[in-house]
């Protein structure tokens, strides 16, 4: 008995000693990490410009007494991070051409005693669009436990081309890259959860050119999971329009092909996935078995319909994992008019879905950061959050590039970060950038960013000078002169009075 008691005391002392020795200081602000200790940008050798290629990266490590544990990463185009099979995050936060923002996640809550697996799906689209820039693909990531890097791209992490996602597919819309079409069997997630998994041949990775790195700066998203209700055969409804990752639980009895179609409204009594000029489907080809499937990209919907094109399956659950702004609770409103109360909450819900890392005009068809829209969104953001972090990122993205590809010298893109190979722009949208800068200074006191914008604003003024007529009015502006779908666009030609009022 005395020996057993002594052994227990020794073990307890050893555990305490190990715990104390492994302590490290936590990172003060996960939003402001802007460097890697060891990680290098990597991708499959010679395939960094290949269209619509998804690679699966994994690394396993041992952890027994973790006081701190983080994953730091960035990528082009985007990633999904899981630890021991559990969803952690989607990212990164968008940035200007040739700049990349680092995300940093506390993964301590996901760790187990012993072997742990960090798994990353990374999609490289290399496609011109308004959401995810057409830039060479890469992943740069490292795992830090107790202040020490235990895995880093460039020397650790193994990558696989599992071909679970088809490459030869159409775009979701003109403004967004490729649709999701998967070919899976029930073992499709073993690569992310199985210790010492080696069921596929790894791809050869090569180091890519060094990247210009920035901090994320903005709050991390809200990933709340909520359920849909079945309202008819194969038809499901969420409580309200929702933006995030569409999930389904399925039992598949035989080889089955199915599509999950979605929209924000019903057309008649069913979903019309093409209504908004999108191909609003996620497609799966499945072998018999049990599945919990979740889209890689975020979408917007209230209604979802299941189309079984071949075979049969039983849908057991439909859910949404939100991908929305998390810091929107500062403002409150309550009165004796319930319709007014509902209107306020609808405004909050609309804002949170359109303010993840920049201000977007819509979270569905485009996910684009449009000027003009941002002028009004930024006012609401300050009311709902009490800070200007998202607005700073939005404006800074317009300041970071030395020049904009395919845009006339001095002009600003109508939306950004985005690709504009058709050379289109909205001249009067650039004026809203200047107006927003003034309000941003009043809201934030951030003189440093406004001063950085001086050259860009002066170049914009110089751009407009050749269009001034003898009356000092702008005449025959080039490209798309746009007053947000107003009939004023067509009433008067050459001298557009709404544009001149904005210019004045």
Stretches found by the model and what they are:
Residues 237-238, 293-295, 358-371, 418-430, ...:
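Solvent-exposed loop and edge beta-strand segments that line ligand/cofactor-binding
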Residues 455-458, 462-474, 488-492, 496, ...:
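Large, well-folded core regions of big proteins
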Residues 2-11:
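Bacterial N-terminal signal peptides that target proteins for export
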Residues 255-264, 374-400, 453-465:
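Carboxylate/His-rich catalytic cores and anion/metal-binding grooves
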């Amino acid at each position: 008995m005395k020996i057993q008691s002594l052994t227990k005391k020794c073990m307890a002392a050893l555990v305490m000693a190990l715990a104390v020795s492994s302590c490290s200081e936590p990172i003060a602000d996960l939003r402001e990490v802007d460097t890697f200790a060891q990680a290098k940008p990597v991708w499959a050798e010679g395939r960094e410009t290949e269209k619509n290629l998804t690679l699966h990266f994994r690394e396993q490590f041992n952890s027994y007494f973790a006081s701190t544990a983080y994953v730091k990463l960035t990528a082009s185009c985007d990633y999904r991070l899981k630890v021991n099979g559990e969803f952690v995050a989607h990212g990164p936060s968008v940035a200007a051409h040739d700049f990349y923002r680092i995300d940093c996640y506390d993964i301590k809550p996901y760790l187990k005693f012993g072997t742990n697996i960090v798994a990353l799906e990374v999609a490289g689209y290399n496609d011109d669009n308004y959401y995810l820039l057409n830039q060479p693909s890469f992943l740069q990531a490292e795992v830090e436990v107790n202040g020490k890097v235990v895995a880093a791209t460039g020397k650790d992490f193994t990558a696989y081309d599992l071909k679970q996602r088809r490459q030869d597919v159409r775009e979701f819309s003109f403004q967004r890259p490729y649709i999701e079409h998967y070919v899976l069997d029930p073992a499709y997630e073993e690569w992310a959860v199985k210790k010492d998994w080696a069921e596929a041949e790894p791809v050869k990775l090569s180091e890519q050119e060094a990247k210009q790195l920035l901090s994320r700066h903005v709050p991390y998203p809200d990933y709340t999971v909520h359920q849909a209700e079945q309202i008819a055969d194969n038809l499901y409804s969420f409580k309200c329009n929702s933006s995030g990752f569409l999930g389904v639980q399925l039992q598949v009895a035989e080889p089955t092909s199915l599509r999950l179609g979605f929209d924000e409204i019903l057309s008649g009594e069913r979903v019309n996935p093409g209504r908004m000029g999108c191909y609003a489907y996620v497609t799966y080809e499945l072998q018999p078995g049990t599945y919990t499937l979740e889209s890689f990209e975020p979408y917007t919907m209230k209604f979802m319909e299941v189309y079984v094109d071949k075979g049969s399956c039983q849908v057991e659950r439909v859910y949404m994992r939100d991908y929305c702004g998390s810091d929107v609770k500062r403002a409150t409103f309550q009165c004796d008019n319930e319709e007014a109360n509902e209107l306020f909450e609808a405004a909050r819900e609309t804002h949170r879905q359109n303010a993840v890392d920049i201000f977007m005009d819509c979270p569905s068809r485009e996910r684009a950061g449009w000027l003009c829209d941002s002028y009004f969104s930024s006012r609401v953001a300050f009311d709902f959050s009490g800070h200007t972090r998202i607005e700073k990122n939005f404006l800074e993205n317009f300041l970071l590039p030395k020049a904009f590809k395919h845009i006339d010298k001095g002009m600003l893109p109508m939306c950004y970060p985005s690709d504009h190979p058709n050379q289109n722009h909205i001249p009067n949208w650039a004026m809203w950038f200047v107006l927003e800068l003034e309000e941003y200074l009043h809201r934030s006191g951030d003189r440093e960013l406004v001063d950085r914008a001086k050259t860009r604003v002066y170049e914009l003024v110089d751009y407009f000078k050749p269009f001034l007529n003898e009356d000092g009015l702008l005449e025959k502006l080039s490209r798309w002169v746009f007053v947000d779908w107003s009939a004023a666009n067509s009433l008067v030609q050459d001298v557009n009075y709404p544009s001149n009022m904005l210019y004045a």
